[in-house]
Structures are given as structure tokens and as C-alpha cells.
């Protein structure tokens, strides 16, 4: 809970006390056991930032796990008589100055995969444009000869792995539909970005996030989508966010809607430390930390 503006009312005092209780709780939250890191597969083991502190390692590890869950679309399991993919939601919560940006390692893992998917989509669009132009020419000649036009080529879906956090309800639905069994991920180190979009009139996609987590069908028929309604069967979505406690409160205003129970929360509070510019650490940008792609 966030600190409220000063007021003599009892509610403000209660909110203030709850805020500091939360901050004290964050100081005592445990780190992942060392045994977790001891038996990691090589792919994950190579992603561990050994020179960082325990909190940074944990946050980076959670980021990597969430990212990898989004690129295993052919992997499934059964839980409570339901079929689930590995996709899951996680949220790293800590005050400002806690080095939460280290969680970008998960995004770096997927950048090359995302670029590969975009390149394929752009190539398919160019191929379609060529076929469509040729189809129009053929139709012109066929009409002059009083012959039937050939079937119009089908426009391919434009796929991408990352769903932008700045989006609308309809745009998110369309992209999840276009991605199909490939799946998607929302990855943003500023939870406020998604919270702001969710509060817009064109947003309000809490229900879609809840359904996607459970792989429940998502249907809609808005005017903006044209005559054909949108049907998404077995949606697959992963989500990783980091932010401050107030950003979490802005995104998850109440537990009654059910979204909090679907998110893995990792919260902590640590003493901010200055990192000198002349340290010996190496860059962990996507040029050094990427998944292999089958081209």
C-alpha cells in the first residue's frame, strides 16, 4: 500500500501504518535457496550473474524463467484436469533504487527470437503484397475476357513475440489471435506503463489477462474488428513486470478481481548502493545473452 497524503483521519493513519509494515516485511523476505542455483541446466546456469548480490541474482533468474516460459509453445502439462503451457506471470516489487533494471536479462534472452519472428512476418507480408498485386492484374484481364477471377490470396498474420505494454484492449486481442500457438509475452521493467494503459477507456484488459493465464477462450465482437468476431482458442501469454509498491497498487487495485492470485510476486527492500562507472562488469545486452534460433 502507498503512503497517503497527510490528513488527521483514522484511515490515513491506518494507511501510513500499513505502508511501513509493508516496508518492514520487504526487508525480511527470503532469497531463493542456493540449492536452486546448484542444479540448473547449462542454459540457465550461463545466465546467472555471479558478480551481483543475492537479490539481483534472484530477480534476474525470475526474469529469465518467465522469458523462457514464453518460447516453449509445444510443452504442456496437466494440472487439476486442465492442460497448461509453461507460460506464467511474475512481478518484481521493490522501492526505487533497488537495481530492478537487472531484470532486463530476460528480455535480452528473447531479443533475437523476437527479431527472427519479425523478419519472417515482414518477409511473408512482402510475399503477400506481390501475390496480391499479381492477383489484381489477373482479375483485370479475367474481367475483360468475361472470365472468373482467381481466389484472392490470404493475407498472413503479422506475428511478434513481445506484446507492447502500451496497448489497447482490441489491439492486444488481435495480436494474441495473430500469434496463435506461438504465444506471446508482455515484458516491461516499468509496471506503470501497463497500469496506465489498463486504466484508459480503450484498455481495461484485466479480464483478458486472467483468461489468458488459465488458457480460457477469449471472444469479442467489436465494431473496430470489422464483421468477423475474434476467437482466441487456448491463448498463451507470459508476463514479467518490475515496479515500485505504488506501481503495483496502481496495476492491482484490488484482490477481488482475481489477477493477484495469478501473479508470482517477488518483493524485497535493500539498501541502495552506488555503482561506480569504472567497474569491471561486462555488458549483458542481447548481443551477449541470446537464445539460439533455427533459421
Regions found by a protein language model. Give the residues of each.
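Phosphate-handling catalytic cores of nucleic-acid transaction enzymes
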Residues: 2-289, 295
Amino acid at each position: 500500500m502507498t503512503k497517503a497524503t497527510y490528513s488527521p483521519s483514522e484511515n490515513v493513519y491506518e494507511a501510513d501504518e500499513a505502508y511501513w509494515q509493508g516496508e518492514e516485511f520487504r526487508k525480511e523476505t527470503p532469497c531463493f535457496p542456493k540449492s536452486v542455483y546448484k542444479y540448473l541446466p547449462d542454459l540457465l546456469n550461463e545466465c546467472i550473474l555471479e558478480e551481483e548480490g543475492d537479490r539481483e541474482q534472484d530477480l534476474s533468474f525470475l526474469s529469465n524463467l518467465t522469458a523462457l516460459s514464453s518460447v516453449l509453445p509445444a510443452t504442456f502439462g496437466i494440472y487439476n484436469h486442465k492442460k497448461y503451457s509453461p507460460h506464467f506471470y511474475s512481478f518484481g516489487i521493490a522501492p526505487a533504487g533497488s537495481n530492478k533494471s537487472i531484470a532486463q536479462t530476460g528480455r535480452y534472452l528473447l531479443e533475437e527470437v523476437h527479431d527472427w519472428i519479425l523478419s519472417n512476418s515482414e518477409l511473408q507480408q512482402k510475399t503477400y503484397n506481390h501475390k496480391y498485386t499479381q492477383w489484381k492484374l489477373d482479375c483485370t484481364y479475367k474481367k475483360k475476357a468475361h472470365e472468373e477471377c482467381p481466389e484472392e490470396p490470404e493475407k498472413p498474420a503479422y506475428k511478434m513475440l513481445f506484446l507492447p505494454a502500451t496497448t489497447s484492449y482490441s489491439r492486444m486481442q488481435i495480436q494474441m489471435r495473430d500469434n496463435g500457438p506461438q504465444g506471446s509475452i508482455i515484458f516491461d521493467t516499468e509496471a506503470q506503463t501497463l497500469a496506465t494503459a489498463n486504466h484508459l477507456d480503450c484498455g481495461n484488459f484485466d479480464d483478458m489477462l486472467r483468461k489468458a493465464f488459465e488458457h480460457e477462450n477469449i471472444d469479442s465482437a467489436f465494431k473496430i474488428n470489422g464483421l468477423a468476431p475474434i476467437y482466441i482458442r487456448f491463448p498463451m501469454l507470459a508476463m514479467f513486470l518490475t515496479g515500485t509498491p505504488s506501481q503495483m497498487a496502481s496495476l492491482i487495485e484490488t484482490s477481488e478481481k482475481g489477477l493477484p492470485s495469478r501473479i508470482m510476486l517477488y518483493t524485497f527492500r535493500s539498501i541502495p548502493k552506488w555503482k561506480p562507472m569504472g567497474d569491471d562488469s561486462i555488458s549483458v545486452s542481447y548481443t551477449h545473452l541470446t537464445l539460439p534460433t533455427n533459421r
